[in-house]
Regions:
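Glycine-rich phosphate/pyrophosphate-binding beta-alpha loops
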Residues: 43-49
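Hydrophobic faces of well-ordered beta-strands that scaffold small-molecule active sites
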Residues: 39-42, 67-71, 90-92
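Surface-exposed amphipathic alpha-helices with a cationic face
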Residues: 5, 9, 59-63, 83-84
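An N-cap/entry alpha-helix motif that binds or orients negatively charged groups
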Residues: 1-35
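Active-site-adjacent beta->alpha loops and helix N-cap segments on the catalytic face
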Residues: 50-55, 71-87
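Short alpha-helix boundary/capping motifs
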Residues: 32, 89-90
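A short, Lys/Arg-enriched amphipathic alpha-helix followed by its capping loop at the start of a domain
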Residues: 37-39, 58-67
Length: 92
């Protein structure tokens, strides 16, 4: 524990004051796909209980935002319908 604590204490956050942040790029890649930010839509089962469009709504939102949608095997409509709703990458 002591070594862990000493190692953690050795880290320091060094704020960079007066640095131009007018053009920040938080994009990254995941499995070869470019993401706008390093945030992805987690698979959620039974989305149709929240919105009638279910997985289609999430797939469209993920595509519009520029991220990846992980699709649950228990959501509706079918995986094929969700895949057809957008040509943006999806992960099952």
């Amino acid at each position: 524990m002591r070594r862990n604590r000493l190692g953690f204490d050795a880290l320091a956050l060094r704020p960079r004051v007066l640095v131009d942040v007018s053009k920040v790029d938080a994009s990254t890649t995941f499995l070869g796909q470019k993401l706008r930010i390093p945030v992805m839509m987690a698979p959620i089962g039974s989305l149709q209980t929240i919105t009638p469009e279910g997985g289609v709504a999430v797939a469209k939102a993920a595509a519009e935002f520029g991220t990846i949608n992980f699709v649950s095997s228990v959501t509706q409509p079918s995986l094929e319908e969700i895949a057809a709703s957008t040509n943006h990458p999806k992960i099952f």
